[in-house]
Regions:
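Short, Asp-centered acidic motifs that coordinate Mg2+ and/or phosphate
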Residues: 69-73, 158-159
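Small-molecule-sensing regulatory modules
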Residues: 1-37, 43-50, 131-310
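A conserved helix-loop-strand patch within extracytoplasmic ligand-binding domains
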Residues: 76-79, 85-136
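Short, well-ordered beta-strand segments
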Residues: 3-5, 72, 90, 119, ...
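Short, structured active-site "lid" loops
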Residues: 45-71
Length: 355
């Protein structure tokens, strides 16, 4: 019996089940799902807490290294950019829809009334919402797909932004009010892709390779090279999306402060013949983002009283523990607004535009 480690959520078990079915056919051997609790499953602790890097994957990897399971399946966007010694991503199956989507009681993003509460705990999504609809209130919500949809249905929030792949995999695609285009919200690096991981010396490695989809691997390699190149943490508002067609990889990436005001966006394309080319393209885009973004963000991040945001990495947002009010003209922002930001303790910041 092949033991496949998975998180316990419906989405995790569903996508792991897809891999398990395919692996069982290839190996002509039964596959058993082994549910493993991860630190990230504790929704009472913010994902941006210092102890949380790799919160959704560390326990799975520990079980793999200990020999408790033979293979694990991750949502690829949850993997830290640094490789894990002794482990390999043996397969990246065909990617599911990569976009972000809106679940809403009031139609599309443009239709939401001013002041509507939009739920997300993703800095990337919050920053994009702040850029394109600064009159909305972005509030942190966590939980599985059903939980977040439920918060919309009960009125706790008016809308929520989720990954399309998750809704499709659990059969909730009918809940989608709008597929948000990459011109508004560039997906997270590797969003919609799965990472099938095993030990480097595993006899299953060759079998798992048959599940690999080359265009998906090339795209994800470029996207994650952007992530590594900007040394992004889980709280960084970064997006990257690559598409591979007829030997050419097109890559779009963006980077923002948490308020969505300081903003950099880069588009590059290159002919690729292998993973090294894809990695090089991602590294080039990362350098271009940092080069383009630094002066723009420094100019945009002034406050109404003449002070500036905290020093350090210019692409990270405010980190103060007390309410702040700042006036932004906004790079690529559709509206002028007075911004109020509140961050309580280690929770994600909440932003509201005040006219």
């Amino acid at each position: 019996v092949i033991r496949l480690g998975t998180r316990g959520s419906l989405l995790a078990r569903t996508q792991s089940g897809l891999v398990a079915d395919a692996l069982a056919r290839l190996a002509d051997e039964p596959v058993e799902l082994v549910v493993i609790a991860t630190e990230g499953d504790d929704t009472s602790v913010p994902l941006d807490a210092p102890s949380r890097p790799g919160a959704f994957v560390s326990a799975l990897r520990d079980a793999l290294l200990a020999g408790s399971v033979d293979v694990v399946v991750h949502s690829f966007k949850d993997l830290p950019s640094a490789p894990a010694p002794g482990l390999v991503v043996a397969a990246i199956p065909l990617r599911a829809p990569h976009a972000d989507v809106l679940v809403s009681r009031a139609g599309a993003l443009a239709d939401l009334p001013a002041g509507a509460r939009v739920g997300t705990s993703s800095p990337r999504r919050a920053a994009a919402l702040a850029r394109f609809r600064p009159d909305l209130a972005v509030v942190p919500i966590r939980g599985n797909v059903d939980t977040r949809i439920g918060k919309v249905r009960t009125g706790e929030v008016d809308a929520a932004v989720l990954a399309a792949a998750g809704l499709h995999r659990v059969g909730r695609q009918d809940e989608i009010a709008e597929v948000i285009g990459a011109d508004v919200l560039v997906p997270a690096p590797a969003q919609g892709a799965l990472a099938v991981e095993c030990r480097a010396d595993s006899p299953l490695r060759a079998t798992l390779a048959a599940l690999d989809d080359l265009p998906t691997r090339l795209a994800v390699t470029a996207e994650r090279a952007v992530l590594a190149g900007v040394q992004a943490a889980c709280t960084t508002a970064i997006g990257a999306l690559a598409t591979w067609t007829d030997g050419r990889l097109e890559l779009t990436a963006d980077l923002s402060d948490h308020a969505g005001v300081g903003y950099a966006r880069v588009n590059r394309g290159a002919h690729v013949t292998g993973l090294a080319d894809a990695d090089a393209l991602g590294a080039e885009v990362a350098r271009a983002l940092l080069s383009q973004g630094t002066p723009t963000l420094r100019q945009a991040q002034g406050s109404s009283d003449g002070s500036s945001l905290p020093t350090g990495h210019p692409l990270l947002g405010p980190t103060a523990d007390s309410p702040l009010i700042r006036s932004y003209r906004g790079v690529r922002t559709r509206h002028r607004a007075i911004w109020m930001m509140r961050q309580a303790g280690r929770s994600l910041p909440e932003y509201r535009a005040v006219r």
